[in-house]
Amino acid sequence: MANVISISHFTLLALPYLLLLLSSTAAAINVTAVLSSFPNLSSFSNLLVSSGIAAELSGRNSLTLLAVPNSQFSSASLDLTRRLPPSALADLLRFHVLLQFLSDSDLRRIPPSGSAVTTLYEASGRTFFGSGSVNVTRDPASGSVTIGSPATKNVTVLKLLETKPPNITVLTVDSLIVPTGIDITASETLTPPPTSTSLSPPPAGINLTQILINGHNFNVALSLLVASGVITEFENDERGAGITVFVPTDSAFSDLPSNVNLQSLPAEQKAFVLKFHVLHSYYTLGSLESITNPVQPTLATEEMGAGSYTLNISRVNGSIVTINSGVVLAVVTQTAFDQNPVSVFGVSKVLLPKELFPKSGQPVATAPPQEISLSPESSSEQPSRLVSPPREIVSSGAVKRPLGFLVLWCWCIAFCYVLV
């Protein structure tokens, strides 16, 4: 009788999992490592790192980067990158990240009329009327590819520098592209250099009270924060890693069930609820979308111990960020403020910690809506809508699995079949 080679069910089940793990690991993008091979892109690479965009891209798995070589940085462009506030500079750089892998063949198929491609700036939630997209066109006679924005003249693609299907393509362009909504005349308030060797005082903190006043629909949250005194504590925590604040809108407080009365809570518990809305790290909206560890500690966690008062942050429907408190499921509805080291986001629900509000009471959690109305920053106009990025208009090789992965997958299936 022929010898039968046995193989455990665990091994059979583990092989597909390991292959999936390897494929997802390979899909992660390290844009700094990619650009390090090109010394002429050092200035652009440094901007991506210092602004935090390089880290933001690590969670993406398919994009095209529009990089400006050192030789193409005019004095005006360099001056612009130095003058812009950090949040505006970050949005400027997000506009140079196309959320679509474009191969050389994809570029050749672009029609003369052009194709709209979504940028990472669109995912920030601060764009309006399609201002987060660029129009990519190709001249059929010369073969040159240009990329346009309503706010500035078109830039020309100089070269397809690097392509790693289906993850990243690096295109060099002859100038920076400025998106609509960024004031190129804006500048940071620069302090003169000290005249003595004594240490200068630390910079003034960001005024959270004024941010919430400017947001127009955070009146209830503001009154609770001021009355409890924790808003001062939040402002003191801006230093170091920074903070991310999730502020319920006024309608979120109106939607609280009748058995939840925050005003009746003891002062200490009320402070815990408010601190439960704050992460002790600075996150942009894009970094929340690509967060690798969904369970995040809050300021309340620091007081009550590891594992308690945590939030579960995830992304659904492409670009909608949800926050699960263990009792309610809230959605990020707007970016009220984003300037390193502080970001403030409006949320659709009051985040109730399970430690204080067990689910045994009236159910509060609801499914996230298909579309979430967003209030524009500091505006009383009709809110725009945060939706998933539009479907890819240019056909892309990004939808195809890597050939090597398919061959490896088929080989493993055949190998297991022979062994069994």
From Swiss-Prot:
Residues 368-384 have a biased composition (Low complexity). Coiled coil: none annotated. Induction: Up-regulated by abscisic acid, cold and drought treatments, but not by high salt. Disulfide bonds: none annotated. One of its GO terms (biological process) is mucilage biosynthetic process. InterPro entries: FAS1_dom_sf, FAS1_domain, Plant_FLA. GO terms for molecular function: polysaccharide binding. Its main location: membrane. Residues 1-28 form the signal peptide. Expressed in all plant organs and tissues, including guard cells in the leaf. Residues 397-420 form a propeptide. Residues 29-177, 205-351 form the FAS1 domain. It is a lipid-anchor; GPI-anchor. Glycans are attached at N30, N40, N135, N154, N167, N207, N312, N317. It comes from the Eukaryota. Keywords: Cell membrane, Glycoprotein, GPI-anchor, Lipoprotein, Membrane, Proteoglycan, Repeat, Signal. May be a cell surface adhesion protein that is required for normal cell expansion. Belongs to the fasciclin-like AGP family. This is Fasciclin-like arabinogalactan protein 4. The lineage of its organism: Eukaryota, Viridiplantae, Streptophyta, Embryophyta, Tracheophyta. The gene is FLA4.
